[in-house]
From Swiss-Prot:
Cellular location(s): Cytoplasm
Family: Belongs to the PanB family.
Pathway entry: Cofactor biosynthesis; (R)-pantothenate biosynthesis; (R)-pantoate from 3-methyl-2-oxobutanoate: step 1/2
InterPro entries to which the protein is assigned, alphabetical: Pantoate_hydroxy_MeTrfase, Pyrv/PenolPyrv_kinase-like_dom, Pyrv_kinase-like_dom_sf
Enzyme class: transferase
Binding note for cofactor: Binds 1 Mg(2+) ion per subunit.
Name the record gives this protein: 3-methyl-2-oxobutanoate hydroxymethyltransferase
Positions that bind 3-methyl-2-oxobutanoate: 45-46, 84, 112
Keyword Flavoprotein: no
Catalytic residues in the record: 181 (proton acceptor)
Role, per record: Catalyzes the reversible reaction in which hydroxymethyl group from 5,10-methylenetetrahydrofolate is transferred onto alpha-ketoisovalerate to form ketopantoate.
Length: 265
């Protein structure tokens, strides 16, 4: 089996072939997801909430993400594997490169960073040193204290225009992929069409090139508040996890998910 690479994702964008991605944190689930057809996985700092029980992603460390990245890589050796750089792990150039290198050594193919134009020097520095970068705009959970909670971003025209500029700046700085979270579908379409790099949405409508969900949301096992954009695919699959993942993939590829009920206007 051939490994999935960024060249595949770029080709899928050109072909307008939508693709489904998930978070994963251990070898068993990573293997199961890959066997059902998931080709891109993210070891997200969401592990702080889903696995460690915190109320935000802020306490997560690079060592935490590296630990789970090693496990996921062993379970899914052929998937394109992204790893989140946690809060304050890319504050200085030296710190950024050391932490990114740790995640790449753990098995990541790409690191994901949250932030806009101010992050361009960091993205450029990593790209020049052969570390592929995925950007993350919209609702960036590491900025929860600035946003005052988990809120939809880019609804006002000024904010929407700035987000588009940030996306283009990150692409120009060398980002190869972009995650767009909790933005109005119209803005998501503008960004997706403006960029040559693939855009993965979460709470951004069905207009992006790909979709991602936290695995716990896709399987309906999230405790507490459930995001509007989430869908319990397990409940629609008679409790069969494999069938649930296949259904998720099918609905993303067909454009059936996310539906209007999962989308912000």
């Amino acid at each position: 089996m051939k490994a999935t690479t960024m060249s595949h994702l770029r080709q899928w964008k050109l072909e307008k072939r939508k693709f489904a991605t998930l978070t994963a944190y251990d070898a068993s689930f990573a293997q199961l997801f890959a066997e059902q057809g998931i080709e891109v996985l993210l070891v997200g700092d969401s592990l702080g909430m889903t696995l460690q029980g915190f109320d935000s992603t802020l306490p997560v460390t690079t060592a935490d993400v590296a630990y789970h990245t090693r496990a996921v890589r062993r379970g899914a050796p052929h998937c394109l594997l992204l790893a989140d750089m946690p809060f304050m792990s890319y504050a200085t150039p030296e710190q950024t490169f050391a932490n990114a290198a740790e995640l790449m050594r753990a098995g990541a193919n790409m690191v994901k960073l949250e932030g806009g134009s101010w992050l361009c020097d960091t993205v450029r520095m990593l790209a020049e040193r052969a570390v592929p970068v995925c950007g993350h705009l919209g609702l960036t959970p590491q900025s929860v204290n600035i946003f005052g909670g988990y809120k939809v971003q880019g609804r006002e025209e000024v904010a929407a225009n700035q987000l588009l500029k940030d996306a283009q700046a990150l692409e120009n700085a060398g980002a190869q992929l972009l995650v767009l979270e909790c933005v109005p579908v119209e803005l998501a379409q503008r960004v997706t069409e403006a960029l040559a790099i693939p855009v993965i949405g979460i709470g951004a409508g069905n207009v992006t090139d790909g979709q991602i969900l936290v695995m716990h949301d896709a399987l309906g096992i999230t405790g507490g508040h459930t995001p509007k954009f989430s869908k319990n695919f397990l409940a629609q699959s008679a409790g069969d996890i494999r069938a649930a993942i296949k259904l998720y993939i099918q609905e993303v590829e067909s454009g059936a998910y996310p539906a209007e009920e999962h989308t912000f206007q």
